[in-house]
C-alpha cells in the first residue's frame, strides 16, 4: 500500500493580505511575493520527492493560482485538479473589503476581535469558523479523504480558515485550539495518515 500523504498549503500572499483588508469570498490576485511563496512551496515539495496524484482547490483565484504555481514548479502541471466552493475562505460578510483598522474604528476592537477569533460568532452577513467547518468538513470526508486513503498523494491549496477546518479534524483540536493556530501563506504542511485516517506523522516544510 502506498503512503497516505495529504499536503495542505495556504495560498500565497494576496493583494488584499498586503493591504490588510478582510477578504473572504472576494477574489484578489496574488502579489509578487505571493507568487514567490507559491513557487517556493513547489520547490520544497519537489525536494521532498513528492509526486501528486490528485489536487483540490477553492473557487477563488488566489488559491487556484497558488496550486498552479506549485505544480508548475514541480513539473507536475497535469495533475487532475478539482475546484470547489466548499474550500473557499470563510465569508466575512459586511467586513469583506474593509481595512481591518477601519473595521476596528467602526465597531470597536473587542467586537472585531470576537468576530475574527471566536469559533461560533459570525460578522454581519458572514460566516463563523463553525459555519466554515460545517461547509468544508463534509467535502473533505466525502471527496478528499477517500483519495488519501486509497494511497493517492493529495495536495490541497486553499485558505486560512478552510484549512483550519481540516486541521481541526486531522489534529483533533478543540475550537479554542484551532482559533490560536496561525497558518503562514505558502507554507506546506505534510501529513501521513494511518489506515483509520488518523495522523501518523506531520511535518511543516520551511525554506
Swiss-Prot record:
GO terms for biological process: gluconeogenesis; glycolytic process. Its EC number is 5.4.2.11. SMART domains: PGAM. The record marks 159 as: Transition state stabilizer. SUPFAM superfamilies: Phosphoglycerate mutase-like (SSF53254). Homodimer. Catalyzes the interconversion of 2-phosphoglycerate and 3-phosphoglycerate. This is 2,3-bisphosphoglycerate-dependent phosphoglycerate mutase.
Amino acid at each position: 500500500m502506498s503512503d497516505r500523504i495529504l499536503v495542505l498549503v495556504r495560498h500565497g500572499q494576496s493583494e488584499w493580505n498586503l493591504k490588510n483588508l478582510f477578504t473572504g469570498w472576494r477574489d484578489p490576485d496574488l502579489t509578487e511575493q505571493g507568487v514567490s511563496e507559491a513557487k517556493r512551496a513547489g520547490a520544497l515539495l519537489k525536494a521532498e520527492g513528492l509526486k501528486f496524484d490528485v489536487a483540490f482547490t477553492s473557487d477563488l483565484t488566489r488559491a487556484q493560482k497558488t496550486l498552479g504555481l506549485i505544480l508548475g514548479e514541480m513539473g507536475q502541471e497535469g495533475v487532475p485538479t478539482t475546484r470547489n466552493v466548499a474550500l473557499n475562505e470563510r465569508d466575512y460578510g459586511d467586513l469583506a473589503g474593509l481595512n481591518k483598522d477601519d473595521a476596528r474604528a467602526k465597531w470597536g476592537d473587542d467586537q472585531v476581535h470576537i468576530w475574527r477569533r471566536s469559533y461560533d460568532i459570525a460578522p454581519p452577513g458572514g460566516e463563523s469558523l463553525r459555519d466554515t467547518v460545517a461547509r468544508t468538513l463534509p467535502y473533505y470526508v466525502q471527496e478528499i479523504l477517500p483519495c488519501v486513503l486509497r494511497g493517492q498523494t493529495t495536495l490541497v491549496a486553499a485558505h486560512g480558515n478552510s484549512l483550519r477546518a481540516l486541521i481541526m479534524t486531522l489534529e483533533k483540536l478543540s475550537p479554542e485550539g484551532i482559533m490560536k493556530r496561525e497558518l503562514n501563506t505558502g507554507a506546506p504542511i505534510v501529513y501521513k495518515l494511518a489506515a483509520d485516517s488518523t495522523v501518523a506523522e506531520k511535518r511543516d516544510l520551511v525554506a
